[in-house]
Regions:
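Bacterial N-terminal signal peptides
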Residues: 9-17
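Bacterial N-terminal signal peptides that target proteins for export
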Residues: 1-8
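Extracellular/periplasmic carbohydrate-active domains that bind, remodel
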Residues: 19-465
Length: 465
């Protein structure tokens, strides 16, 4: 029987990073050198995988790569001062096409370009693990017990690649693209300037991200079809949504700081707890879609983008790009604070393309405080599944006067236990489509707004996010 050992270098590195220790069998350290480091690093990863598992350590300095595949039981470990620098050429990222260690079936490969018509449907390139859209600076496919760990001061830099046939005709590869993985650990590093999402994780189980920082680029952490996910003590300052995804079960987001030019959360799932998080707007980094074509091609910094307002604290998300296994329900937002978001809650089911999948059953806000809001809460539910909305021990304050706190339709129950509102001169709810039914309101300890439900004769008009 082979006995697992602790290597001294492995113990020291894990201690410095603050991440959970793992026994390692094989350790290889790679120093920074001039030129393309892809082959040297990938060969070390493959050797560790072939040996049954191990750690590949990158020393301080710049490691320029095209794309890397991290495999089962392998830890990619970045020492302090180490930087993985991605290629700006999107054609450099098709590594799964020629993988001889773990070959990928041709049926899972496509180089199809992005199209507007397919952007929200299942019948598109997102379902192919080895698609152009799923390409990433670091790839994981079907990996078990894999990890990417960085000491403080380590960086994964996507280099703002431009792809003229990528999403929205400019977005490049993802930062870390992980599909069908189990027991995935992400810890300690800073990831920035990715061509698309910093983390694209799909159909995976037991995912843990801790003390990760995401800067600029697009979505910070985007998960679909994942179970048992923990996002702890992370910082995301992004030009797109900080934490996004749907069809996720048993998700905990705790002690995170979020800053964005889009939504702090564009999310859905079952048994979701968002706890002790802080959101601040406007975004430090602008939305890259607002850059000129010339700036996108040149890889200009995200700070040049003209729009940086934070659109919402929580926007519901469910489109047709991924099968939805369970009802979206039991979402709890607890002990969170925010300042400077346009909206606090945005649910506009069926009226915009990112909210035409499965409807939301219920969401609860408990001991939350929001200041500097600019627009009422949006809550347009599904006639077949009216929304249940709960506020307990909450405070909501608006930057300028509003005519109502909530505008919406197809609401089932609104349950309030201590809610203080500032900046609203009007009812609790302004209701559209009154003939479809009036919500049942139970309000105790409501301050700053009347517990009224007032019908509206106006045309429903809420700008999509």
């Amino acid at each position: 029987m082979k006995v697992k050992k602790w290597t001294l270098v492995g113990i020291v590195g894990v201690f410095l990073s603050g991440c959970t220790c793992k026994p390692v069998e094989h350790t290889c350290r790679i120093g920074a050198e001039e030129g393309d480091a892809t082959q040297r690093i990938q060969q070390a990863i493959d050797a560790a995988f072939t040996a049954g598992g191990g750690t590949v350590r990158l020393g301080a300095g710049t490691h320029a790569v095209k794309s890397l595949r991290v495999r089962s039981r392998v830890t990619l470990y970045l020492e302090k001062g180490a930087m993985i620098l991605g290629s700006r050429n999107p054609e450099d990222y098709f590594i799964l096409d020629s993988d001889r260690i773990e070959p990928v079936s041709p049926s899972l490969i496509t180089h199809e370009a992005w199209t507007i018509e397919q952007s929200c449907t299942l019948d598109n390139f997102t379902k192919y693990p080895a698609s152009r859209w799923n390409n990433g600076l670091i790839r994981l496919l079907g990996a078990t017990d894999a990890a990417i760990i960085g000491e403080p001061g380590s960086v994964i830099d996507g280099h703002d690649p431009y792809d003229p046939v990528g999403e929205e005709f400019y977005r490049g590869p993802q930062g870390i693209s992980a599909i069908n993985c189990t027991n995935l650990t992400l810890c300690g590093y800073t990831i920035r300037n990715t061509g698309n999402w910093a983390h694209r994780i799909a159909d995976s189980r037991n995912v843990r991200a801790e003390k990760v920082t995401g800067l600029a680029g697009h979505d910070g952490f985007h998960i679909n079809g994942c179970d048992q996910v923990r996002i702890l003590g992370c910082t995301f300052k992004t030009g797109d949504d900080c934490i996004a995804g749907f069809d996720n079960t048993d998700v905990v987001v705790r002690d995170c700081f979020l800053n964005t030019a889009c939504s702090g959360f564009r999310f859905a799932g079952t048994d979701v707890l968002i706890e002790k998080c802080t959101l601040r707007g406007p975004g430090e980094y602008g939305f890259r879609g607002a850059l000129s074509k010339e700036d996108k091609i040149a890889g200009a910094p995200s700070g040049r983008a003209k729009r940086n307002n934070m659109l919402s604290f929580f926007t519901y998300y469910a489109d047709g790009t991924h099968p939805i296994r369970r009802p979206a329900a039991k979402i709890r937002i607890v002990d969170c604070t925010s300042h400077g978001t346009d909206r606090y809650f945005h649910y506009n089911y069926g009226n915009e393309k990112w909210q035409r999948g499965q409807p939301l059953a219920d969401i609860s806000f408990i001991r939350v405080t929001a200041t500097g809001l600019k627009l009422p809460l949006s809550a347009w539910g599904d006639p077949a599944l009216p929304l249940s909305l709960t506020f307990k021990d909450c405070r909501l304050g608006f930057e300028r006067p509003q005519k109502e706190l909530i505008r919406g339709a197809h609401l089932g129950t609104v349950w309030i236990d201590n809610l203080e509102v500032r900046g609203v001169d009007g009812p609790l709810i302004r209701l559209w489509n009154e003939k479809a039914g009036t919500p049942q309101v139970s309000a105790s300890g409501l301050k700053g707004v009347s517990a009224e439900v007032v019908p509206s004769s106006d045309v429903w008009s809420v700008r999509g996010i």
